[in-house]
């Protein structure tokens, strides 16, 4: 089997799903700083996407935006081909878009289960399938899935979310096997990184300080991990966990003094 990934990945065209805000925005900024042409995917937040596009262009980079509802499998399946009309063939796919809602055995609904699995698992699979199919014959490619350190522990209060992210972890490994040697497939699992929608500032502070290292990660650290993956030609099928050690010292829900 002939090796294709022999050195650091040269900048080309990248798409980041959910790229207009939070961790996705940091990844877009990092990739642009490394010389990549970036496509900022968004679902409903067009203003943030446009503002980020203008920021990248102002700094001398190339950026475009594209809208798609990843809860719709048809939209997910068509996103790569539509994106390639912007700057040409993609060589980097970052599956960052995610749905994160809490549900339990009692509160879980079919709708909750479906949207988590559609966005967090099915969309990355369909995007990866299209990406692999359209990747130029002699070009190496990379797929990076943004997962969660929660894959190390079952969470009864986040059934749909935890299940979908665990599926994405195994999908990372299976795709790394199936798409080698041409495409490397990797994952990053952040812990406490940014305040969640249900959290108060105090909740997030307590969560971050509860981990073994006393602090979680930052969006910039996740972006640095992206750069590490791009530069590590032998790295595939693995998860980089950036959580201050939270996966080593899980706190039961009933013992927590904060909301996730």
Task: Briefly describe each language-model feature range.
Residues 3-4, 153, 236-260:
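Short C-terminal tail/terminal secondary-structure segment
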Residues 34-51:
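Conserved glycine-rich Rossmann-like NAD(P)H-binding loop of the short-chain dehydrogenase/reductase
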Residues 169, 179-193, 235-242:
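Conserved Rossmann-fold SDR core element
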Residues 219-242, 247:
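C-terminal substrate-recognition "lid" of short-chain dehydrogenase/reductases
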